[in-house]
C-alpha cells in the first residue's frame, strides 16, 4: 500500500521497533509523515531502525521533525513510565500514536514448561503492553490530546497453538486488555485496537523448522506467509483518521488462516 502522508502531525511511539514487524511499522509510519520514537530492549537495534527512516512529512525535501531511538525494558513499570517521560522530553509532547509490538517467545509443551518461561513471556507480551498503554493513556489524558493505541496481539491468542501456552495466553490477554481500554478511554478521544498477525516472515518465524513452515503455509488460504509490511499497512490505517470510528477492534492479518 502506498503511503499517503496521513500522519504528518503525529508522533508515534513504537516498541519492539528494532526488527521484524516493529521495524516495518516504524518505517511505514515515518513514510506516512509521522515523527517516530523507536524503542527496543536492544538500543542499538532501535538506532538502526531510526537510520532507515526519512524526515517526517518531507515529500518536498524540507524536514519537518525528527525521529529518535530509545532503549527500555517495557516489562518493568519504572522503565515503561520513564520511556514515556523521555519521549515527551525529546518531542515536547506525548505520542498520539502508540504501537506496542515488543514480544518474545519461549516455547515448550505445557507438561514441561517452566514457571520462569511462563512468567517472562507474560511479563513482556502482556504486562509490557499494559504498562505502555497505561503510561501513554495517562500522558494523553493529562494533555487533553486525542490518540490511537494499537497493540500487536497474534492469531495464536485467538486459537491457541501447541507448545505455546505462555505465548497464546499473553496474546489473548492483549486482546482483552485492548477491548477494555477501548471502553474506558473512548470518552477521552483515545481509540484502542489490536492487530492479530498470522504467520509472518520475521526473525521469530525463521526459527521454525522447514517442515513446520510448509505445513502452516498449506493451511493459509492465500497460500503464503505474510510480510511485516502487511501488518504495517493495517497499523498505519488504524493510526490514521481513516479509522476514526473504529475502536475495540481485533484485526486479523493472517491470509485467512484459522478463519
Curated annotation (Swiss-Prot):
Location of the active site: 167
UniProt-annotated binding residues for substrate: 154
Its EC number(s): 1.1.1.n12, 1.1.1.62, 1.1.1.239
Tissue: Kidney, liver, testis, ovary and spleen. Oviduct, uterus, mammary gland, vagina, prostate, clitoral gland and moderately heart, dorsal skin, brain and lung.
Principal localisation: mitochondrion
Subcellular location: Mitochondrion matrix
Domain of life: Eukaryota
Presence of keyword Aminoacyl-tRNA synthetase: no
GO BP term (any one): androgen metabolic process
Pathway: Lipid metabolism; fatty acid biosynthesis; Steroid biosynthesis; estrogen biosynthesis; Lipid metabolism; mitochondrial fatty acid beta-oxidation
Residues recorded as bearing Phosphoserine in the entry: 58
Binding site for NAD(+): 13-21, 40-41, 72-74, 167-171, 200-202
Alphabetically ordered keywords of this record: Acetylation, Fatty acid biosynthesis, Fatty acid metabolism, Lipid biosynthesis, Lipid metabolism, Mitochondrion, NAD, Oxidoreductase, Phosphoprotein, Steroid biosynthesis
Annotated catalysed reactions: a (3R)-3-hydroxyacyl-CoA + NAD(+) = a 3-oxoacyl-CoA + NADH + H(+); 17beta-estradiol + NAD(+) = estrone + NADH + H(+); testosterone + NAD(+) = androst-4-ene-3,17-dione + NADH + H(+); 17beta-hydroxy-5alpha-androstan-3-one + NAD(+) = 5alpha-androstan-3,17-dione + NADH + H(+)
Family per record: Belongs to the short-chain dehydrogenases/reductases (SDR) family.
Function: Required for the solubility and assembly of the heterotetramer 3-ketoacyl-[acyl carrier protein] (ACP) reductase functional complex (KAR or KAR1) that forms part of the mitochondrial fatty acid synthase (mtFAS). Alpha-subunit of the KAR complex, acts as scaffold protein, required for the stability of carbonyl reductase type-4 (CBR4, beta-subunit of the KAR complex) and for its 3-ketoacyl-ACP reductase activity, thereby participating in mitochondrial fatty acid biosynthesis.
Assembly information from the UniProt record: Heterotetramer with CBR4; contains two molecules of HSD17B8 and CBR4.
Protein's recorded name: (3R)-3-hydroxyacyl-CoA dehydrogenase
Organism: Mus musculus
